[in-house]
Regions:
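Repeat-solenoid scaffold signature
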Residues: 205-240, 245
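Surface-exposed loop and turn segments in beta-propeller and other repeat-based domains
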Residues: 68-82, 131-149, 189-210, 252-283
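Conserved blade-ending motifs and adjacent loop-strand segments that build the rim/top face
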Residues: 214, 325-345
Length: 368
């Protein structure tokens, strides 16, 4: 009887997946599972690096085979929204073996903040280590609470490192210039400050700032023109897709398309034109996380589109970008919270579910 029940459950699950696939413009292939996966990136040979929020990093083959957890990853402060976050490669990884990790770290007492470290990924045969690990950036100041770290990273074509720094649920720091909370920062690859940053003359942590007035930016991506875009969690609704421009102020917490969680209104962007407005705002929320701007050939009709991971929306949201304008085009129900979307070397899509036992999914054209 138990075997019959298992068979029926598996058959029902299979039919559900097939029915789901039939309604989607891609085929879904589960590849592996992880405990609270957060981010991934591709190595030059097609393997992936995948982070788990609790502090583990894996080297993963495209068939789902995993290494043992990479050793000597920095200790993380795992609580709330904190833990191990993003992972990206140095632009010259093939020669210097450097990878970058973002994570939440504890401070003295009950304060904590995001940090970025880099180290050389070395090893083979399923066993890997990080060597010469150094912390190159920290949120300043560290504060109490355990949310809104942001800590997404992206390199531009010139080798500058951009990091999103959330407001840490403190509101006002996003508008204050004596810290880097609620900002997007721009650094050299070693963590030093570029000489042409917009506020470099002010020195100290202010010199890092590229843009301000952000709440919790959980995605960063460059388009083919070299422009930086970000996805940002709003308060009660009001999630955003922003075109991030040097020295611009995006207005939070003074303006937002959402409201405070207690229901108190926040003025909309159109009431304060001095602040940069989002290119897309979502009411109700989609809870955007990681995203890409697609440049591959497997889905040529989507070239130049943003593909956004939706947490609360349990979807992939496709946004068409036309010059400086953008609009949601379609929403693909994935049946689970989606944390990350990445483009593989062949142009297929790779997706991480946000859960204990969250799956790594490969999305391919329906006729592949």
């Amino acid at each position: 009887m138990l075997r019959q029940i298992i068979f029926l459950v598996c058959a029902t699950f299979s039919v559900a997946i097939q029915a789901e696939d039939a309604e989607l413009p891609f085929k879904i292939s589960p590849v592996a599972t992880f405990n609270e996966p957060w981010a991934m990136t591709f190595l030059p040979d097609g393997r992936m690096l995948v982070t788990e929020k609790r502090g583990r990093l894996f080297v993963v083959k495209q068939d789902g085979g995993k290494s043992r957890p990479v050793e000597d990853v920095p200790n993380v402060d795992y609580r709330g929204q904190g833990g191990l976050g993003d992972v990206i490669l140095h632009p010259d990884f093939a020669n210097n073996e450097l990878i970058y990790l973002s994570y939440a770290e504890s401070g003295v007492g009950k304060v904590r903040g995001a940090a970025v470290a880099r180290g050389r990924l070395v090893g083979e045969g399923g066993k890997y280590d990080l060597k010469d690990v150094e912390v190159i950036w920290r949120q300043n100041p560290k504060v109490t609470d355990d949310g809104h770290y942001g800590h997404r990273m992206a390199f531009d074509a010139d080798g500058y490192l951009f990091i999103s720094s959330g407001d840490r649920q403190k509101f006002q720091p996003a508008q204050q210039m004596n810290g880097n909370l609620g900002k997007v920062v721009r650094l050299n690859a070693d963590g030093s400050v570029p000489e042409d940053n917009p506020f470099v003359d002010r020195g100290d942590v202010t010199a890092q700032i590229w843009s301000l007035g952000h709440r919790n930016p959980l995605g960063l991506a460059f388009d083919e023109k070299g422009r930086l875009w970000s996805t940002e969690m709003g308060p009660l609704h009001g999630d955003e897709l922003n075109l991030v421009v040097k020295s611009s102020n995006y207005g939070y917490p003074i303006v937002s398309e959402g409201d405070h969680y207690n229901g108190d209104p926040i003025p909309d962007h159109d009431t304060r034109p001095e602040f940069a407005a989002p290119k897309v705002a979502w009411v109700p929320t989609i809870a955007p996380a990681g995203f890409i701007i697609y440049s591959g050939t497997q889905f040529p009709q989507w070239k130049g589109n943003a593909l956004i991971a939706g947490l609360a929306s349990r979807a992939i949201i496709r946004v068409e970008i036309d010059g400086d304008s953008a609009s949601e085009a379609e929403r693909y129900d994935m049946g689970a919270r989606i944390r990350e979307v990445e483009q593989g070397p062949e142009g297929n899509l790779w997706v991480l579910e946000d859960a204990d036992g969250g799956r790594l999914l490969k999305l391919t054209p329906p006729d592949s």
